[in-house]
From Swiss-Prot:
The lineage of its organism: Eukaryota, Viridiplantae, Streptophyta, Embryophyta, Tracheophyta. The record marks H152, N224, E337 as: Involved in substrate discrimination. Its cofactor is Mg(2+). Mg(2+) binds at N176, D261, F263, N264. The keyword Transmembrane helix does not apply. Keywords: Magnesium, Metal-binding, Methyltransferase, Transferase. This is Probable methyltransferase TCM_000331. The keyword Transport does not apply. InterPro entries: MeTrfase_7, MeTrfase_capping, SAM-dependent_MTases_sf. PANTHER family: S-ADENOSYL-L-METHIONINE:CARBOXYL METHYLTRANSFERASE FAMILY PROTEIN. GO terms for biological process: methylation. SUPFAM superfamilies: S-adenosyl-L-methionine-dependent methyltransferases (SSF53335). Its EC number is 2.1.1.-. Gene3D superfamilies: Methyltransferase, alpha-helical capping domain, Vaccinia Virus protein VP39.
């Protein structure tokens, strides 16, 4: 397998940036919020008001969503302190992690408004919140031993540490022609390669986090998952539409067929049973809660979680922009930037002809043994 970094999202605030087009990521957090809040409440009895609570958000990216999870953590602790009638609350050390290529400058420009909001809303007696950026892959060590109380990550651990592509290794997926991911037409070795790489990566992730967390520390992870046991039966198939648009460019002579055949998106959507099995086998964490949630894919219907009828071309363009926000850097690296506008124009047309569909997410809460 060829090594590849976990992809970064589009930075900045342009129309196709992650900050502008991360609506599915924005709507899944409120659905995961009850589990995150319950996890914090379970932690509360073991936390002193004189402690400094160390919280890490892994794969934070940049944009409006960056501080959403941290805000829930801070708000819930504040609520618990008020209920316990504590005169003071803990201080917070927040670590925002992503790859070095992430737009950390955008994050840092938002820190002051985040901390000002906390101070204004909760008063001077509420513990200070210190924010630090931590560049690096979460498939390596990021923090000292036994230093973290709480780890959160949303839609990040799906990204694989390596691309499951090889034309020389028998179990690679060099024969996944016509696709950019797992599809019904993909041969069995494609599914096996993705599944095996995810198991290896997630096991490594759990092992490393267990070293960095205090005994009894908590971790809440949200995955883009699947509701079907069989990997080829994906709940969302924007990747299928992206493949169609890409191979249209092959037919037009804009993209070489060999280049298209050698591109695969390095991600994996697990089934809930796979997550349980990996967590139990790695054995650093007790599985506390696991919940499968569904969200709509679309522009405004994602925001309201209701099924509205929209102009299909607007919906198609919005969906294409959302896909571009998370895939453009890797596509540009593989094909160059010249094909991107035409590629995503084609994707928008394919998406415009589709009916709305649901995305499956899996929220997991764990406790460090």
């Amino acid at each position: 397998m060829v090594k590849a970094s976990v992809p970064c999202m589009n930075s900045g605030d342009k129309e196709t940036s992650y900050g502008t087009c991360s609506l599915p990521q924005e709507i899944v957090l409120p659905k995961a919020r009850p589990i995150l809040e319950d996890t914090i409440k379970d932690m509360f009895s073991n936390v002193s008001s004189t402690d400094c609570i160390k919280v890490a958000d892994l794969g934070c990216s940049s944009g409006p969503n960056t501080f959403m999870a941290i805000s829930i953590v801070v708000d819930t602790f504040h609520e618990m302190c008020q209920q316990a009638q504590l005169k003071t609350s803990p201080e917070f050390q927040v670590f925002l992690n992503d790859l070095p290529e992430n737009d950390f400058n955008n994050i840092f420009r938002s820190v002051a408004s985040f901390t000002d909001r906390i101070k204004k809303g909760k008063g001077d007696k509420f513990g200070l919140c210190f924010v630090t950026g931590v560049p690096g892959s979460f498939y390596g060590r990021l923090f000292p031993n036994r230093s973290l109380h709480l780890v959160h990550s949303s839609y990040s651990v799906n990204w694989l540490s390596k691309a499951c592509i090889s034309f020389h290794v028998p179990d690679g997926i060099g024969n996944n022609k016509g696709s950019v991911y797992m599809a019904e037409s993909s041969p069995p070795n494609v599914f096996k390669a993705h599944s095996r790489q995810f198991k290896e990566d997630f096991s490594t992730f759990l092992k490393l986090r267990s070293q960095e967390m205090i005994p009894g520390g908590r971790m809440v992870l949200t995955f883009n998952g699947r509701s079907n046991l069989y990997p080829s039966k994906q709940d969302d198939d924007w990747k299928l539409q992206l493949a169609k648009s890409l191979y249209d460019l092959v037919v037009e002579g804009i993209v070489k067929e060999a280049d298209a055949d050698s591109f695969n998106i390095p991600m994996y959507a697990p089934y809930k049973g796979e997550l349980c099995e990996i967590i139990q086998k790695e054995d650093s964490f007790d599985l506390d809660k696991l919940e499968v949630v569904q969200i709509n894919w679309g522009p405004r219907d994602v925001l309201t979680n209701e099924d509205f009828e929209f102009d299909k071309y607007q919906r198609g363009q919005k969906t294409a922009n959302s896909v571009r926000a998370i895939t453009e850097p890797m596509l540009a690296s593989h094909f160059g930037e010249d094909i991107l506008d035409k590629l995503f124009t084609g994707l928008a047309k394919y998406e415009a002809e589709r009916l709305g569909y649901k995305l499956t997410s899996i929220v997991v809460s764990m406790k460090k043994k």
